[in-house]
Amino acid sequence: MKILITGRPGVGKTTLIKKLSCLLQNAGGFYTEEIRESGKRIGFKIVTLDGEEGILARTDLPFPYRVGKYYVNLKDLEEIGVRSLEGALREKNLIIVDEIGKMELLSSKFREVVEKIFDSEKDVIATIKKSSDPFVERIKSRDGVVVFELNEKNRDSLLKEILYVLKFNRGENNDTGAD
């Protein structure tokens, strides 16, 4: 099953992904976290589910690529993020990707591994930007992809809903609640 989580920035997509990755077994991949100094966001780091970390983007390190005020570090994205996705594709049952967004899409290696992941039989939970980007739209419109929009009203219930849908699809819970 392929699950995409979308929503406005700051609504809690990464928090939801982190909770799901803790609750679900045999998962691999990565999520992103803010880097803050003096209460201000100055960048993002990549954190793999097995604990490896790298810099995705910062405002104060002049990497060659830029998205808004952030300089994007494709080296760490590819050596840490993409490598974790490739490993998860080989060895895990569930692949976590946070996120399929503007910064990550600068990397052709990232786009390639995302295509492989969505072509695979593996379960996937990914966050994805709201966008008219052709790559993003192609991923969202694939057969078998379920898109959940996270917002303030459903952020407490969506965790349970995603767990239920994933487990039901795996055949782990065939009780629909209907008598």
From Swiss-Prot:
Keywords: ATP-binding, Hydrolase, Nucleotide-binding. It comes from the Bacteria. It is an enzyme of class 3 (hydrolase). InterPro entries: AAA+_ATPase, Nuc-triphosphatase_THEP1, P-loop_NTPase. ATP binds at residues 7-14, 94-101. Disulfide bonds: none annotated. SMART domains: AAA. GO terms for molecular function: ATP binding; ATP hydrolysis activity. The keyword Hydrolase applies. Has nucleotide phosphatase activity towards ATP, GTP, CTP, TTP and UTP. May hydrolyze nucleoside diphosphates with lower efficiency. This is Nucleoside-triphosphatase THEP1.
